[in-house]
Regions:
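Phosphate-handling substructures
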Residues: 41-94
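Acidic, His/Gly-rich catalytic cores of divalent-metal-dependent hydrolytic chemistry
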Residues: 156-175
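Generic beta-sheet signal
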Residues: 106-115
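Domain-level recognition of soluble alpha/beta enzyme cores
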Residues: 125-155
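Active-site-proximal alpha-helix that buttresses catalytic centers in soluble enzyme cores
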Residues: 1-47, 83-86, 140
């Protein structure tokens, strides 16, 4: 893990350590697991990985501001070999609903990626779009609390983020 990754993991632990956490779920990608690993160890919990929480398959055209705008304007658009926003959203909501069903009245942590999280936020608030996505990919780690009653979102609060000079800003500057 890089020094920056270690600092990110410490930030997550510092935020969570006074909470009661029942379970940790995560994308199987190493960087997401590393970000929540220190907190999971603190709570003596295993990290349950779920392939559906992974990042979007980017395909042949890569990631640039124009492609971000195109994908968010048409959630069904995807380049060859890549996933659309709708595809990512479907698998993430399926995973989230299963996690919520298995953890009724429990406090859980989900470690995932910018696009994956953005599709979840868009599912519950369709005004969440490309500019919101670009904002949060510059804020990793980004801690947001979502409160559910069953599978219904009843509350949302941003708690913590680390603002970084990341690709979203660079891409936005290259409009």
């Amino acid at each position: 893990m890089t020094e920056e990754g270690k600092k990110d993991s410490e930030i997550v632990l510092e935020f969570l350590k006074d909470k009661k956490i029942d379970a940790f779920y995560c994308s199987p990608y190493k960087r997401s697991m590393d970000t929540i690993a220190e907190a999971a160890a603190f709570f003596t919990k295993e990290i349950i990985t779920d392939e559906r929480l992974r990042e979007r398959e980017k395909g042949s055209d890569g990631n640039n501001h124009g492609m971000f705008q195109k994908r968010w304007a048409d959630h069904d658009y995807h380049e060859e070999g890549g996933e659309s926003i709708a595809m990512v959203q479907n698998r993430n909501i399926e995973a989230l609903n299963e996690i919520l069903s298995d953890n009724t009245d429990k406090e859980i942590v989900i470690g995932t990626h910018g696009t994956a999280l953005s599709t979840i936020l868009n599912f519950y608030d369709n005004s969440f779009g490309c500019e919101d996505f670009l904002r949060i990919i510059d804020w990793m780690p980004y801690i947001i609390e979502l409160d559910f009653e069953g599978d219904k979102l009843v509350g949302k609060q941003e708690h913590c983020h680390v603002e970084k000079e990341f690709k979203g800003k660079q891409r936005a500057d290259k409009k």
